[in-house]
Amino acid sequence: MTPLIFVTGGVVSSLGKGIAAASLASILEARGLKVTMMKLDPYINVDPGTMSPFQHGEVYVTDDGAETDLDLGHYERYVRTRLSRKNSVTTGRIYENVIRKERRGDYLGATVQVIPHITDEIRRCIDEATAGFDVALIEIGGTVGDIESLPFLEAIRQVRTERGAEKAMFMHLTLVPYIAAAGELKTKPTQHSVKELRSIGIQPDVLLCRSEQAVPDSERRKIALFTNVSERAVISCPDIDVLYGMPLELRRQGLDELVIDQFKLRDKVATADLSEWEAVVDAVKHPLDEVTIAVVGKYVDHQDAYKSVAEALKHGGLRQRTKVNLTWLEAQDLEGSDMAALQGIDGILVPGGFGDRGFEGKVQTSKYAREHKVPYFGICYGMQAAVVDYARHVADLDAANSTENDRQSPHPVIGLITEWRTATGEVEKRDEKSDLGGTMRLGLQEQRLKPGTLAREVYGKDVVAERHRHRYEFNNRYRTQLEDAGLVISGKSMDDTLVEMVELPRDTHPWFLACQAHPEFLSTPRDGHPLFIGFVRAAREKKAGGKLLKEARA
């Protein structure tokens, strides 16, 4: 039976439960344990796939095509375990499962209730996702006191009651605000948050105290006294300059030792080797170069909408000790402009998106990068914008467009995918009447790269696999016409039916590459990703006037 660490939050949301949990997981992994993570979200949506990026941030996609909370992105950036749809569960999915069972008659005529049926389903999902691991960390979304979270909290209370402290730990993240007028930290919100937890039968084993500054020992003792938590288990989590340094900070305070002692794992663990995280922090703090990248998107007012893109760009810089400064530009604002906002930029990235708002701004951005020889990296919608730009302005296909935005376009160079083969070999079919939720081409898909192309050079191999999330695709009827006009199709699906990557010849542009996949989902701070590393290097070369010293490379 896998030992479980349940991570809850109190006082306010957005304190960083996901980062804290992932940091602890990375330490346990560094000590030789097989670790997994899970997110329980209290919203009633079945998954975040149809939620607005302005409300929820990005939708993170796993290998098996699950559309999940962005916290799973944090998890995979900190631990080596690849997650799946089992690791992201919402209230909507729980109720959907229970109602389906009720309709089948699985409950044999019983009155279906929150307790035991909903809580039993939550526990079943937890068991399914965590089986076979040495330790599992499970984050409960929201804040203690929210009515939506109650079934999840009741379920984990039951788990602790049945399994005991050696198999279930409660870790509570709470706010210790600093009141500038008084010049002191206030522990009362934390006391009340723990009181709220205890009122529903949960006594925290560990408190993570988030604050602007380190919580002094005197305040830690006070918190321990009022919350019935060991002083050793009251951990200070102050703001830090480099988030990827959180594993080092938690290790310094012995959080992993608390877990190992409570779960009696001493004979299974080794000494923690956090040298990779030390190297990451050192690269962030001591860069040797600096570039400015413009991200031209549709949801830039909510930067969590592009969380993985922003992190992947930073990772690309880390691998070559380069600080990446991001300039966020709203695509719609560039429509009809003189593109002055892009002057002095070392590289341009156009990320994914949906709908016609801002699409013309993305097309103009691609045109600007192509004509001014600025390194360009298009992702998903960014690739489609690049194809439309090339079709209109190079291949002379007037009014070329995507059918997502103009169904009457005389040259629909981007169209709806109606049929494709999944990674498991199954054939998926869609039409314009299909539901929006869960109907895209999703998950890890292999593609073959064309020899001699930039894509092949950057990846260093012939076949690669990337995660996808798209409903529209390069229209195959225009392959020959656009290739004859000079566009290079550098990546195709393994069955040759879908265009995966396009680029410009190296003799016409130093670095112009666009992909239908979302490579940002496979980038990590310790390893980076070939496309982002190559893109940042191209930006460095542009800044250096095309001459980059070999010894300055990663």
Swiss-Prot record:
ATP binds at residues 14-19, 71. Pathway: Pyrimidine metabolism; CTP biosynthesis via de novo pathway; CTP from UDP: step 2/2. Residues 292-545 form the Glutamine amidotransferase type-1 domain. The active site is at 380 (nucleophile), 518, 520. Residues 1-265 are annotated as: Amidoligase domain. GO terms for cellular component: cytosol. It catalyses: UTP + L-glutamine + ATP + H2O = CTP + L-glutamate + ADP + phosphate + 2 H(+); L-glutamine + H2O = L-glutamate + NH4(+); UTP + NH4(+) + ATP = CTP + ADP + phosphate + 2 H(+). CTPSs have evolved a hybrid strategy for distinguishing between UTP and CTP. The overlapping regions of the product feedback inhibitory and substrate sites recognize a common feature in both compounds, the triphosphate moiety. To differentiate isosteric substrate and product pyrimidine rings, an additional pocket far from the expected kinase/ligase catalytic site, specifically recognizes the cytosine and ribose portions of the product inhibitor. The keyword Amino-acid biosynthesis does not apply. It comes from Xanthomonas campestris pv. campestris (strain B100). The keyword Magnesium applies. This is CTP synthase. Catalyzes the ATP-dependent amination of UTP to CTP with either L-glutamine or ammonia as the source of nitrogen. Regulates intracellular CTP levels through interactions with the four ribonucleotide triphosphates. Pfam families: CTP_synth_N, GATase. Allosterically activated by GTP, when glutamine is the substrate; GTP has no effect on the reaction when ammonia is the substrate. The allosteric effector GTP functions by stabilizing the protein conformation that binds the tetrahedral intermediate(s) formed during glutamine hydrolysis. Inhibited by the product CTP, via allosteric rather than competitive inhibition. PROSITE patterns: GATASE_TYPE_1. InterPro entries: Class_I_gatase-like (IPR029062), CTP_synthase (IPR004468), CTP_synthase_N (IPR017456), GATASE (IPR017926), GATase1_CTP_Synthase (IPR033828), P-loop_NTPase (IPR027417).
